[in-house]
Design a protein with these regions (language model features):
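Beta->alpha loop/short-helix hinge microenvironment recognizer with preference
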Residues: 1-391
Length: 391
């Protein structure tokens, strides 16, 4: 019998058999454990009692995994809020760098190496072209975010880049080209293709690449060269989405991409003893949503393809927005443009305070009578109780 479900439900039902059949790596097992036990009490609980009516509130802690659908809201809100101090009232563009599907098997076999290479190639492309006086002639700033999935949770590594539509020239003066994106898409595509394939060849020459599964055939130097030749001949898809202007619209837009995972709970429609049904975008039919049914273990396999390598940094800042530059140079840009500084509202707030600011809910007040919620234990160093609620 079918029932509506969450990602956690799917993992509880199908992950044990998936693990027995596939022997996943340690960081995959850890991710699965986090998802299955998030907000179940396995990561601790926080208990508070109303001083007036005695009502008891029990809050199960989250796992805080970046792959858990229940743990993304707070990190996303805090990250976006922190960016307010670095966003200018200036044009911004959303550029997406993709690679041919022929490279997927090699990239998946060498995730850390070739994901890093994606960032380097995208960054080098934007820096080189933006500094060229033919296009802009300035140092720009941008944020790169790696996504590895398509709508059906298929493997589709690509880089989303939020690009500031102007920069500082050699005389430290602000320079922009107006409403139109300053780099031709065809030029971006060709330069990015050359730089990424150069990265790939360099890693091959240094014998740093590994070849697993369908990538094993590329251990042969002739097959590897054939692959590179084929990729050189293809037109790589690099495109720029609709531009947006103004700091607040940029901040809101960023939230769509920064803390996404491969699939969210609301896209899962049903689960049986053997299958999972979820909705995907049908790009052959103008992006309409349609239902797709796959086996439960296949769902787990697809989800696990998008667990990032251990300690991998998905959100990276470059140019004017890099940690080294943004304090002085963004302040200088703001002064040149005459725009105000946006002040962070969530900085240094704890979970209780964030809930109060974001959702206008005071978890330190009893939901039954409005009394104060306190810890059931009295602090021996204090004459008062302290509410202890942690998300």
């Amino acid at each position: 019998m079918e029932k509506s479900c969450t990602i956690q439900d799917v993992f509880e039902r199908f992950y044990p058999s998936y693990e027995k059949r596939n022997s996943p790596p340690a960081h995959h097992r850890k991710t699965a454990y986090h998802i299955m036990n998030c907000k179940t009490g396995a990561f601790g609980v926080n208990i508070s009692v109303c001083e007036d009516c005695g009502c008891i509130s029990i809050h199960n802690n989250s796992c805080r995994s970046r792959c858990s659908p229940m743990c993304q809201e707070f990190p996303k809100e805090k990250w976006i809020d922190a960016q307010k101090e670095n966003v200018l009232d200036a044009p911004y563009y959303h550029v997406v760098f993709t690679v041919p599907e022929e490279l997927n098997s090699i990239i998946y076999s060498n995730q850390k190496l070739l994901y890093d290479a994606l960032y380097r190639a995208a960054s080098a492309t934007l820096n080189e072209l933006a500094k060229d006086a033919k296009y802009l002639g300035a140092n720009i700033g941008y944020i790169c975010i790696l996504h590895t999935w398509g709508s059906a949770m298929n493997y589709h590594p690509h880089i989303h880049t939020i690009v500031l539509g102007g920069g500082l020239d050699d005389e430290n003066k602000w320079k922009e080209t107006g409403g139109k994106f300053f780099l031709p898409y065809g030029v971006i595509s060709k330069v990015f293709r050359g730089k990424y394939l150069d990265e790939l060849k360099s890693l091959w020459n240094d014998s740093k690449l590994k070849f697993h599964g369908t990538a094993e055939k590329y251990q042969n130097s002739y097959r590897f060269k054939e692959l590179l030749d084929k990729c050189y001949e293809k037109n790589w898809v690099t495109y720029c989405k609709e531009t947006f202007n103004g700091a607040q619209s940029v901040i809101n837009y960023l939230g769509k991409y920064t803390h996404r995972i491969a699939i969210s709970n609301h896209r899962i429609k049903s689960m049986t003893d053997t299958t999972v049904t979820y909705v995907v975008k049908d790009y052959k039919n103008e992006g309409c949503w349609k239902e797709k049914t796959i086996s439960g273990e296949e769902f787990i396999r697809r989800f696990m393809m998008h667990v990032p390598p251990k300690r991998f940094v998905r959100i990276r800042h470059y140019g004017l927005l890099s940690c080294r530059n943004k304090r002085k140079k963004i302040t200088h840009c703001r002064n040149l443009l005459g725009c105000k500084k946006y002040i962070s509202t969530l900085k240094n707030l704890n979970a209780v305070e964030m809930i109060r600011v974001l959702y206008h809910i005071d978890v330190c007040k009893c939901s039954s009578c409005g009394g104060n919620m306190v810890s059931p234990r009295k602090d021996k160093y204090s004459s008062s109780f302290r509410a202890h609620m942690r998300c």
